[in-house]
Amino acid sequence: MGSKCCKTIHGGIFSKAEDTLVDYKGKYINLEKEFSALSDTESEEELQLEKPLLNKQDSSVSLTQKKLENQSK
């Protein structure tokens, strides 16, 4: 009977989302502050570093096309 009573009280008082984390004392754990930085990981520097890579890929395609043209001659 004790466990059923505790579950009922816990469910009534602490009714939150199903994915809410609770520690051993019954306190809710909010990980939003710790992991908010992970959602915005791409910086402007990283974007600038990616741009030359895209240009290199474009040039490699054109080099491949030139090789094919030279082979067909």
UniProtKB/Swiss-Prot annotation:
Pfam families: U71 (PF17474)
Similarity comment text for this entry: Belongs to the herpesviridae cytoplasmic envelopment protein 3 family.
Gene Ontology CC: host cell Golgi membrane; host cell plasma membrane; membrane; viral tegument; virion membrane
Modification note: Myristoylation and palmitoylation (probably on one or more of the nearby cysteines at the N-terminus) enable membrane-binding and Golgi apparatus-specific targeting and are essential for efficient packaging. Phosphorylated. Phosphorylation does not seem to be required for recycling to the host Golgi apparatus. Packaging is selective for underphosphorylated forms.
Name of the coding gene: U71
Keywords: Host cell membrane, Host Golgi apparatus, Host membrane, Lipoprotein, Membrane, Myristate, Palmitate, Phosphoprotein, Virion, Virion tegument
Biological process, per Gene Ontology: viral budding from Golgi membrane
Superkingdom of the source species: Viruses
InterPro entries reported in the protein's UniProt record: Herpes_UL11_megaloV/roseoloV, HSV_CEP3_betahv
Lipidation (N-myristoyl glycine): 2
Organism this protein belongs to: Human herpesvirus 7 (strain JI) (HHV-7)
Membrane topology per record: Lipid-anchor
Location(s) in or outside the cell: Virion tegument; Virion membrane; Host cell membrane; Host Golgi apparatus membrane
Protein name (record): Cytoplasmic envelopment protein 3
Subunit details: Interacts with cytoplasmic envelopment protein 2; this interaction is essential for the proper localization of each protein to the assembly complex and thus for the production of infectious virus.
Role: Plays an important role in the cytoplasmic envelopment of tegument proteins and capsids during the assembly and egress processes. Also participates in viral entry at the fusion step probably by regulating the core fusion machinery.
